[in-house]
Amino acid sequence: MSQIYISRTGPPGEVSERRPQPRPVPGPGEVLIRMKAAAINPADLNFIEGTYGKKPVLPCVPGMEGSGVIDSVGETVADSFPNLTPGTLVLPLASPGNWSTWRVLPATDVLALPAATDPLQAALLRINPATAWGLLHAAAAPAPDSWVVQNAASSAAGHCVIQVAKSLGLKTLNFVRRPESIASCLAIGADLVFLDDADGLTAAKAALADAGAPAPALALNAVGGDSALRLLDLLGIGGNHVTYGAMARQALKVPNGLLIFKTLVLRGFWLSRWQESLEPGALTEIYLTLARLANIGRLQQQIAATYPIEEYLAALTHAATSARNGKVLLTF
């Protein structure tokens, strides 16, 4: 039984350490979780480096996503939370802290998942599926059969957008960097996929015209630079352009004419802040909806590899590789 911790920020492979972890005892109102799996996300690596929007309070255990099984519960839990019983698969809602064999959390920070949920897919529910849901609801929710356009469609978040949008009755127009990424997007329900360049933009406009489709009302930008401008070009009057990433590391420079004559709305999205804005209970319902989609095969995330926690250094190296095909997870 062990956990990964950091006492300083820096390169993840240098500042992350593994230490033994004795089995804790939950107090009143708490549950003890035996973790099953935890994701290694780019946000986790940035968190360890000290470059994420939320700075670590040192020393700490990283890990924003994970799933586990309740091992035992403290006093009062059985009466107040009858669904949190030993053996129940749960989603820890408090983070960081998931790169650990054991977690003790208040019962209020734990969500019981449907029994059929795959623990590996459950460990990937908190960030990308929730991001997709939040992005699609960041502005006024698009009407069924309306079009949403996005770049970085082959990313984990992009794949989630395609699948969640499909479950909501929306159509997606997607841009990818590489030709080999087109098939994977179509396989999970993308309606249209084009290369993210000038020719791709021309082809996208022609495809929308051929379909008799109105201009998209929502664009989701994870890249920035010229790619973000192509999304703006496709939006209709009054459309919303939501930025949640900056993969190209290029500033978003918007021509005045697009803002003036199309009255576009530009906004940012950060998952943590969006979650804080939700009404009590809303986040629980969102995660349960996402879990149900995962259970019926309509929301699946690709997994590149799993590593036992003892091999955390190899896992960190793999997770930092841009060429990996899917998510990297620690198992316990």
Segment roles from a protein language model:
Residues 175-179, 222, 245, 270:
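N-terminal Rossmann-fold cofactor-binding loop
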